[in-house]
A protein has these predicted regions:
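Non-catalytic accessory/interaction domains
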Residues: 207-210, 231, 238-249, 254-259, ...
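Hydrophobic helix-coil surface modules that form long, contiguous segments used
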Residues: 191-202, 208-400, 429
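Glycine/proline-rich low-complexity spacer/linker segments in large multi-domain proteins
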Residues: 82-97, 158-220, 241, 310, ...
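Hydrophobic alpha-helical and helix-loop surface patches within well-folded domains
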Residues: 5-23, 36, 288, 320-627, ...
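Solvent-exposed beta-hairpin/edge-strand motifs
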Residues: 71-125, 225, 229-230, 664-674, ...
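Early extracytoplasmic/domain-onset interaction patches
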Residues: 1-73
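A surface-exposed beta-strand-loop module
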Residues: 50, 60, 66-67, 97-176, ...
Length: 753
């Protein structure tokens, strides 16, 4: 027979431990990783929306392997005409199509995207042989690169910057037609090294647009040349502030470095408005440096307002920055930098102390995207300055999420191209904690188990396991963000408990900070640091698309038969009398005038008048003999008057989970009982469990605190009860689209009339 147990260990699913990655989930004694250092010069041509650049990459081979070629990522090529990313993306036509959708299809087809490479040379200006395969480029090395050796080479390139509002994308620009200005959010803007390790060899899986990035750590020096009236935000630290900022701005910046309470405005809204009026033809070069980062991103605009505040992380000062246009106010000035600071503090508590010198939030319509020390975030009020609740909390949530990505995957550097959940899921989990610490009862979208129920009970043909490659995931947001975040919340609150979970999660973060973890490293560390066997949990939640639906089928109530004829005969007599409540018996009293035994004495015998519930001397003697043969413990049990309740459960959804029960007693007091998931170890389909209780129960509730993501609450109660589905009744169409702030303003104006 095959072992199909849901508690089967994950020996077959997880890779064999080795000198690079241990069975405990920690890096092995021969763990290594490569290094890629960059010197980059880029210039923004605002008129033509072209970015021109050149770079020197120094690649260091720390592996024990000899390398004969290098793989470089050309992510911009995903936007090249007829790229695999475009050809493999699916779309469809309907009987009605909006102009916007049709125009976007045309714009994507017509856009001349992708890197234009002018030269690929070594540092002695010798041409290097290379082959481009879609979003990957293989460079042939002049000679083999052995362990500990480095190789430097140069690439000169350019590409057309995409209009994000027309064709989408993680980076690009947003054009403000009324004033003729733009906000540039620039990333994947330079050819980048692929990762080489003992897990994948070269991770050169093509970039098709969804599965994000797998990148080695390195040091960056980046010179960014833009129009002189632009303000630039970027990964790393600004090294030439005196060349690009005026004296007042530098003075405000220095003030912000000492202000830990409120943000300080460095570039004001009035200054940004002045910058917007005229497009300078002059250029300025901003120089940034970053140490031990895996990537680099930047943003540039003359529209930017800039504010900042200091954050204390374990005695070290870290700067929180926000860059946003006037269109972002009042939301951004009030919240963005404060949210950045809050996020750094909470994530540092639950993972590792934030190690970088700054974290930046940049306003960018319609996207949320992350890079080391910088992220691009949506959240724009209405033109009148009001905003909906959804806009406010959506903005705060996306800032927390994208700033949180500094930890996952920028520091704890997982393979996004392979496993989206390892950064998005873990990040969304800590995002939930951060949101709840920002505001009590914060309306978090993801994290609470009941929020994932609709997804998990859906059609299984449209649901893939969490352990699915990024490009093949179905229902991307629920699969890679919502479900893993929910799973970790359930581990923390229900399976492991906060103390064990938090220690283990922090251990994983510390072990794999500035390294490249895999799913096995995470799974093994969580068990290693807690002494909790979680293989059943990983198997069910991460390797299947099963859901939670545990049914409380039946509750049977038992009482001990004392053997005492005086007691038991009375009970039996009452039970027999209850049977006579049958309506036919009561009607027979009037419809049957006389029975045969009432008419004819000859039809009467012993049993006609025999009372089986009358105690006689023999019954008493039998009872006394029975009692005499009992020891004291047995006599106590006999006298205890305990209630024995046998509960029957079925596992309908397939996921084995802990059983949480709330008993309500006849005196309306309650008791909660928590049973580990291992109760299903012998039979994962149906189980019975007996509970010995002092008081009678009137109600049993399964999963009373909605902590297991059970998809069907209608089979969770005894006595059974249905949860009502509420419906809304309306008259005609509600055409009022104002947000609550607009309505409040209108109400105030009306009351003042």
């Amino acid at each position: 027979n095959l072992n199909n147990s849901k508690f089967k260990q994950l020996y077959e699913e997880l890779p064999t431990p080795n000198v690079y990655r241990t069975a405990s989930g920690a890096p092995g004694h021969e763990y290594y990783q490569q290094k890629a250092d960059y010197e980059i010069n880029v210039e923004l041509d605002e008129e033509k929306n072209i970015l021109k650049g050149n770079e020197i990459i120094t690649y260091t081979n720390n592996s024990p392997d000899v390398l004969n070629y290098l793989w470089i990522q050309l992510d911009q090529n995903v936007r090249a005409k007829n790229s695999h990313g475009q050809l493999t993306s699916t779309n469809s036509m309907n009987n009605k199509m909006s102009f916007r959708n049709i125009k976007r299809m045309h714009d994507r087809m017509d856009f001349d995207g992708g890197f234009k490479l002018e030269e690929v040379k070594d540092t002695y200006n010798n041409d290097l042989s290379y082959v481009i395969n879609e979003t990957m480029m293989r460079i042939e090395l002049p000679k083999s690169l052995r362990k500990g050796q480095s190789f430097s080479f140069k690439i000169k390139y350019s590409y057309n910057i995409n209009d994000r509002m027309k064709i989408g994308g993680r980076s690009g620009y947003e054009y403000f037609e009324k004033e003729g200005n733009a906000i540039y959010t620039i990333a994947q803007f330079f050819p980048r090294m692929a990762v080489y390790n003992e897990v994948e060899g070269w991770q050169n899986k093509q970039f098709l647009g969804r599965g994000e990035f797998t990148l080695p750590f390195g040091d960056y020096k980046v010179n960014i040349t833009v129009p002189s009236d632009h303000i630039v935000a970027a990964t790393g630290e600004l090294k030439n502030a005196s060349s690009v900022l005026n004296k007042n701005q530098i003075k405000r910046w220095e003030k912000a470095k000492k202000n830990f309470i409120d943000p300080v405005i460095i570039v004001s809204q009035e200054e940004a408005k002045e910058n917007e009026k005229e497009k300078s033809k002059l250029k300025k070069t901003w120089t940034f440096e970053a140490k031990n980062v895996r990537d680099f991103g930047w943003a540039s605009s003359r529209k930017f307002i800039w504010d900042a505040m200091a954050v204390d992380i374990s005695g070290k000062t870290v700067m929180a920055y926000s860059y946003y246009p006037k269109e972002g106010n009042p939301l951004w000035e009030q919240y963005s930098t404060r949210v950045v600071a809050h996020t750094l503090k909470v994530y540092s508590e639950y993972t590792i102390d934030y190690i970088y010198p700054q974290a930046t939030s940049v306003h960018a319509k319609s996207i949320g995207m992350e890079y080391p020390m910088i992220c691009f975030n949506f959240g724009r009020p209405e033109s009148d300055g009001t905003y909906s609740k959804r806009t406010k909390y959506g903005m705060i949530g996306v800032i927390i999420h994208e700033v949180g990505h500094n930890f996952f995957p920028m520091i704890i550097n997982s393979d996004e191209r392979q496993w989206t959940w390892m950064d998005e899921g873990l990040n969304t989990f800590v995002q939930y904690i951060t949101e709840q610490e920002f505001e009590r009862n914060y309306p978090s979208r993801r994290g609470p188990p009941n929020n994932i129920v609709e997804y998990m009970k859906g059609d299984k043909s449209g649901i893939s396991p969490i352990m699915t490659n990024s490009e093949s995931i179905l229902q991307f947001g629920n699969n890679a963000y919502g479900k893993p975040a929910t799973a970790l919340n359930i581990l923390r609150e229900t399976v492991m408990g906060r103390e064990l979970f938090d220690y283990s999660f922090k251990t994983y973060s510390e072990r794999w900070a500035f390294k490249h973890p895999t799913p096995a490293d995470f799974f093994r560390t969580m068990e290693d640091a807690s002494a909790v066997d979680l293989d059943w949990f990983w198997r069910g939640w991460f390797y299947t698309n099963d859901h939670v639906d545990i049914s409380l089928d039946k509750v049977n109530w038992f009482k001990i038969n004392t053997g005492n004829p005086e007691i038991e005969n009375t009970i039996s007599k009452n039970q027999e009398e209850n049977k006579k409540r049958y309506i036919g018996i009561s009607r027979n009293k009037s419809s049957i005038k006389k029975t045969i035994t009432e008419i004819d004495d000859q039809s009467i015998d012993f049993y006609t008048t025999y009372d089986p519930f009358k105690t006689n001397i023999l019954d008493e003697e039998d009872y006394n003999k029975y009692i005499k043969n009992l020891d004291e413990d047995e006599k106590e049990i006999l006298k205890s008057e305990k209630n024995y309740y046998e509960l029957n459960f079925s596992n309908i959804g397939g996921l084995v989970m802990p059983i949480i029960l709330e008993f309500t007693f006849v005196d309306l007091t309650t008791e909660v009982v928590r049973i580990p998931a291992e109760i299903w170890k012998k039979n994962s389909n149906q189980i019975k469990k007996v509970f010995i209780l002092d008081k009678e129960i009137v109600k049993v509730q399964l999963d009373p605190f909605l902590e297991t993501a059970d998809v069907n609450l209608n089979n969770n109660s005894w006595p059974a009860r249905n949860e009502p589905t509420r419906f809304q009744i309306y008259k005609g169409k509600d055409r009022n689209n104002e947000n609550p702030m607009q309505r409040a303003i209108r109400a105030e104006e009306k009351s003042n009339e």
